[in-house]
Amino acid sequence: MKIFFAILLILAVCSMAIWTVNGTPFEVRCATDADCARKCPGNPPCRNGFCACT
């Protein structure tokens, strides 16, 4: 059973790494462009209260 959970954890980490490279699958709220620089890869602008991560 521990091996099963270890495999699930590895898959979850890998899928999150892929999402980070391709852009987040969810909306990231921001107040300034500096917030997006910390939360998204690259340096996306803050538009209408959300980061343009994709």
From Swiss-Prot:
SUPFAM superfamilies: Scorpion toxin-like. The keyword Signal applies. It is found in: Secreted. GO terms for molecular function: potassium channel regulator activity; toxin activity. Keywords: Disulfide bond, Ion channel impairing toxin, Neurotoxin, Potassium channel impairing toxin, Secreted, Signal, Toxin. Expressed by the venom gland. InterPro entries: Scorpion_toxin-like_sf. GO terms for cellular component: extracellular region. Disulfide bonds join 30-46, 36-51, 40-53. Residues 1-23 form the signal peptide. Has the structural arrangement of an alpha-helix connected to a beta-sheet by disulfide bonds (CSalpha/beta). Potassium channels inhibitor. Belongs to the short scorpion toxin superfamily. Potassium channel inhibitor family. Alpha-KTx 14 subfamily. This is Potassium channel toxin alpha-KTx 14.x. It comes from Olivierus martensii.
